[in-house]
Swiss-Prot record:
The gene coding this protein: rplI
Name of the protein described by the UniProt record: Large ribosomal subunit protein bL9
Disulfide bonds: none
Gene Ontology biological process: translation
GO terms for cellular component: ribonucleoprotein complex; ribosome
Coiled coil segments of this chain: none
Keywords per UniProt: Ribonucleoprotein, Ribosomal protein, RNA-binding, rRNA-binding
Native organism taxonomy: Bacteria, Bacillati, Cyanobacteriota, Cyanophyceae, Synechococcales
Length: 152
């Protein structure tokens, strides 16, 4: 009986690996948990071919997503400055603060493209003025945009 067996994961398994990973596990773990619950399949040449095909498709998809993010970053750079209007009191102090939702709305108004507010990092803004905001477009692509906060 071998000390370790190789299996290909069909789904993410905590502390073991992600979907499509080739991992070595104890035979009992594979036989009693991974294989019966469909979380993994034994390694065969046909399975390895499927895994390689799946990885190639995923790499193509990731490349397309990265290219779209780069194109969107170029569009953001072309626009240059985004404006958020907030109510202010004395000395241009804002009532409240500028949130990442406000910035996402300003980007959406200017580009007609929706962006998740959780991908925007806004410094604490309590006054009108010009600020730099970071937008995460992809795991490898970020953009710095210029944000102008004005009073209305």
């Amino acid at each position: 009986m071998p000390k370790r067996v190789q299996v290909v994961l069909n789904e993410d398994v905590l502390s073991l690996g992600k979907d499509g990973d080739l991992v070595e596990v104890a035979p009992g773990y594979a036989r009693n948990f991974l294989l019966p619950f469909g979380k993994a399949v034994p390694v065969t040449p046909a399975v390895m071919k499927q895994v390689e095909h799946r990885r190639a498709k995923e790499a193509e998809r990731q490349a397309a997503l990265k290219q779209a993010a780069l194109d969107f970053r170029t569009a953001l750079d072309t626009i240059g400055r985004f404006t958020v209007k907030k109510q202010t009191g004395e000395d241009n102090v804002l009532f409240g603060t500028v949130t990442n939702g406000d910035v996402a709305e300003a980007i959406q108004d200017a580009t007609k493209k929706e962006i998740d507010r959780r991908d925007i990092v806004v410094p604490e803004i309590h006054r009108t003025g010009k600020y730099s905001v970071t937008v995460k477009l992809h795991s490898e692509v970020t953009a710095e945009i210029n944000l102008e906060v004005v009073s209305y």
